[in-house]
Amino acid sequence: MTDYNNESEMTTEYEKMRSQQLYCFDDAEVMASIVRANELCTKLSIMTLASPEYRQTVEAIIPGIPQSSVIIPPFHCDHGHGITVGEHTFINCDCIMLDGGEITIGAHCKIGPRCQFFTPQHPIDYEERMQPVETCHPIRIGDNCWLGGGVTVCPGVTIGPRSIIAAGSVVIRDIPADS
């Protein structure tokens, strides 16, 4: 069994999370990031696109999101600053992005309602799973993709450009371009 109290030199749990290393998810810095995102997502959940604070709140959750991209509330993420969204992308309501690992969504994408993006991977070994640890693996969605309602994208998956994923699909492996 792994010793989770033996921290590597000069590496925070947050840095481990971002670099696909096993990290402790109840670390104070990680939890502060989650709490911040949760507060902002809760605030966004009662807004409409016409709300005066809508754009400011979306940009606080996902820094750098283009003006041309839209998120329909409610929306939930773990951190927000692990998400990159391209130009003219539409993310429908009830989207969940667990972004301990980076989530990149290309330009001109359509993300259906209730889509879920999960970057965390819990340990396979049951004894390790009893500890508050996991790894996170990036998800990448290419340009011009369409994910139907209720799609689940699992840790480490890349969906190639111009692909269409049918509603209700669970994507566990990479999808080539034009699929």
Each language-model region and where it sits:
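Short glycine-rich loop/turn motifs that provide flexible caps or phosphate-binding loops at active sites
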Residues: 19, 147, 155, 165-167
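Short secondary-structure boundary/capping segments
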Residues: 14-15, 61, 131, 138, ...
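Flexible, glycine/small-residue-enriched loop-and-beta-strand segment within the central core
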Residues: 52, 75-85, 90-159
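Terminal amphipathic alpha-helical/low-complexity segments used for targeting or macromolecular assembly
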Residues: 1-68
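C-terminal/domain-terminus segments
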Residues: 159-174
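Conserved beta-strand-loop-alpha-helix hinge in the C-terminal portion
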Residues: 177-179
